[in-house]
């Protein structure tokens, strides 16, 4: 139902001209849609319309009011938060203060930890330096020369202590002459023993020096023997090269003989092929003779078959005659229908027999024709094979001549290749000799650099040792200068502090021979347990290798 503003239904205004309008078309107002029956429209007052509209929009209006209240509350909450954000007597303020205090404490603890870590790092660095210095001092004290110096220091202290004890005993038993004499004898005996020990050590040093000189002479003899061996190896290499050239010439002459032999065999083979061709022609004639005999036998078989067919035909005629006689008897004895059936069977049998005879004759003619065609094709194939054999023989001869020419070219290339290889080997030998000389020179320079560095390191160690020994001797000499001789003697034994003889060409150094293991124990002398030939290139030359 459509509702419009206006009068109520059924209360139309009376007018005099209504009748005239009823007959005409009633125009629709602009607010009404077209094609609407005005009698179906209900008109309500404005207050009623407002009430209806308010009832329809109530939910929307209430939702808008709720949203406005919620927005106002949220705005008030934000304003309250901004207002109490810096207050300290609230839960949030106290929580924030606690967090800040905790963060500050953590930062202070972290700063203290960093300071402690830095102090610990400095302490560890100092400990490491102390450990390194202690290890260096320990390593310095473990050297043989320092050990010998410490032995001298200990000997001087022992001698000083012994003199103190002797003096004490002398003062205690001064009246005992016998004891004094005994002490004197003991001193003389000890002095004599010291002299004997010193003489023994001197003899040992002389023996060690003689042993070293003997080893040097042996090394010189070994070097001379090695040079002689190398010269002998060079002569042997020249002899081997000469034998190799002679062997190559023999191989070339042998290959030429093989070429001549192969050429001769080729000619003999061609002669044998002519003989084989004659034999094959004879075999072909024999085969033709076999074919002719086969044709004759085939003709004989055909004739026998024809005779057999004639005999069969005669027998069939006799059988037909017997059948006719029998049928003539049956005609008299049986009914007409049976006679007709028998006559029809006989006629069919005769037709079938004639058909078989005709097929046999056609088959015989076809066999004869096939035999003639086969013979003609065989003769034609023989002629074609003979012509093809002649062509192949000619081509084979040309191929042999071409192969001979190619073989000669290959032999020529091989000889050139052998010459080039010899030249390359010679160049390689020259280059290898130059490389070996350069390597030997380089190794010599490296060895000289090593000895120079060793000398510098020895001088530095000698200065360090002298400084240490001077400080110790000065400290010990403050109390007494009488017993400083063992320390001075240990210091003056020579540079290096080893047990070997001093090397005059290297500043008088006495080398310290050590074991080849991790202990580094001082050895009394040098003794090599390895191979004498530790040079790889020299070992190869000694064994005869040239690469």
UniProtKB/Swiss-Prot annotation:
Q: Which residues form a coiled coil?
A: 50-131, 183-251, 342-405
Q: Coiled coil: is it a keyword of this entry?
A: yes
Segment Disordered: which positions?
Answer: 214-237
Q: Where in the cell is it found?
A: Cytoplasm, Cytoskeleton, Cilium axoneme; Cytoplasm, Cytoskeleton, Flagellum axoneme
Q: Do you know which Pfam families this protein is assigned to?
A: TPH
* Example GO BP: flagellated sperm motility
- Provide the alphabetized UniProt keywords: Cell projection, Cilium, Coiled coil, Cytoplasm, Cytoskeleton, Flagellum
Top-level division of the source organism's lineage: Eukaryota
Gene Ontology annotations for the cellular component aspect, listed alphabetically: axonemal B tubule inner sheath; axonemal microtubule; sperm flagellum
The reply to whether Plastid figures as a keyword in the UniProt entry is no
Known role: Microtubule inner protein (MIP) part of the dynein-decorated doublet microtubules (DMTs) in cilia axoneme, which is required for motile cilia beating.
On subunit structure and binding partners, the annotation says: Microtubule inner protein component of sperm flagellar doublet microtubules.
Query: What is the protein's given name?
Result: Cilia- and flagella- associated protein 210
The record lists the organism as: Mus musculus (Mouse)
Q: Encoded by which gene?
A: Cfap210
């Amino acid at each position: 139902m459509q509702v419009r503003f206006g009068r109520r239904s059924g209360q139309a205004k009376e007018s005099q001209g209504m009748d005239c309008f009823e007959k005409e078309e009633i125009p629709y107002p602009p607010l009404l849609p077209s094609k609407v029956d005005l009698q179906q429209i209900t008109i309500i007052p404005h207050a009623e319309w407002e009430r209806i509209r308010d009832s329809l929009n109530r939910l929307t209006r209430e939702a808008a009011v709720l949203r406005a209240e919620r927005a106002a509350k949220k705005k008030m909450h934000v304003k309250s938060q901004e207002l109490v954000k810096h207050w300290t007597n609230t839960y949030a303020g106290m929580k924030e203060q606690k967090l800040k205090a905790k963060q500050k404490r953590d930062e202070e603890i972290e700063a203290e930890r960093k300071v402690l870590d830095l102090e610990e790092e400095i302490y560890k660095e100092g400990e490491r330096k102390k450990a390194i210095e202690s290890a260096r001092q320990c390593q310095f004290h473990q050297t043989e020369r320092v050990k010998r110096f410490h032995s001298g220091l200990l000997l001087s202290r022992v001698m000083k202590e012994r003199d103190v004890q002797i003096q004490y005993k002398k003062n205690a038993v001064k009246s005992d002459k016998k004891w004094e004499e005994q002490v004197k004898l003991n001193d003389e005996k000890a002095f004599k023993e010291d002299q004997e020990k010193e003489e023994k050590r001197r003899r040992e040093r002389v023996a060690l020096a003689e042993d070293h000189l003997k080893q040097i002479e042996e090394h010189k003899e070994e070097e001379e023997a090695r040079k002689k061996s190398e010269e002998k190896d060079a002569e042997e290499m020249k002899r081997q090269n000469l034998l190799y050239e002679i062997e190559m010439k023999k191989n070339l002459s042998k290959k030429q003989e093989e070429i001549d032999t192969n050429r001769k065999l080729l000619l003999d083979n061609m002669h044998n092929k002519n003989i084989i061709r004659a034999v094959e022609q004879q075999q072909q004639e024999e085969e033709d003779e076999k074919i002719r005999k086969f044709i004759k036998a085939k003709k004989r078989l055909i004739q026998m078959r024809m005779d057999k067919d004639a005999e069969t035909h005669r027998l069939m005629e006799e059988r037909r005659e017997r059948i006719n006689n029998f049928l003539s008897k049956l005609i008299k004895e049986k009914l007409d229908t049976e006679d007709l059936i028998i006559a029809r069977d006989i006629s069919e049998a005769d037709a079938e027999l004639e058909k078989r005879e005709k097929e046999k004759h056609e088959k015989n003619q076809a066999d004869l024709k096939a035999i003639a065609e086969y013979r003609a094709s065989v003769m034609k194939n023989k002629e074609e094979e003979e012509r093809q054999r002649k062509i192949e023989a000619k081509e084979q001869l040309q191929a042999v001549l071409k192969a001979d020419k190619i073989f000669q070219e290959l032999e020529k290339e091989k000889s050139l290749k052998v010459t080039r290889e010899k030249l390359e080997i010679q160049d390689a030998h020259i280059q290898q000799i130059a490389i070996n000389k350069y390597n030997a020179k380089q190794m010599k320079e490296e060895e000289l650099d090593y000895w120079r560095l060793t000398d510098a390191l020895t001088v530095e160690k000698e200065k360090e040792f002298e400084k240490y020994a001077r400080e110790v001797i000065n400290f010990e000499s403050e109390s007494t200068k009488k017993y400083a001789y063992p320390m001075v003697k240990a210091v003056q034994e020579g540079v290096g502090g080893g047990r070997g003889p001093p090397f005059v060409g290297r500043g008088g150094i006495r080398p310290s021979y050590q074991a080849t293991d991790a202990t580094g124990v001082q050895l009394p002398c040098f003794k090599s347990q390895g191979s004498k030939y530790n040079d790889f290139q020299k070992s190869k030359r000694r064994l005869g290798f040239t690469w």
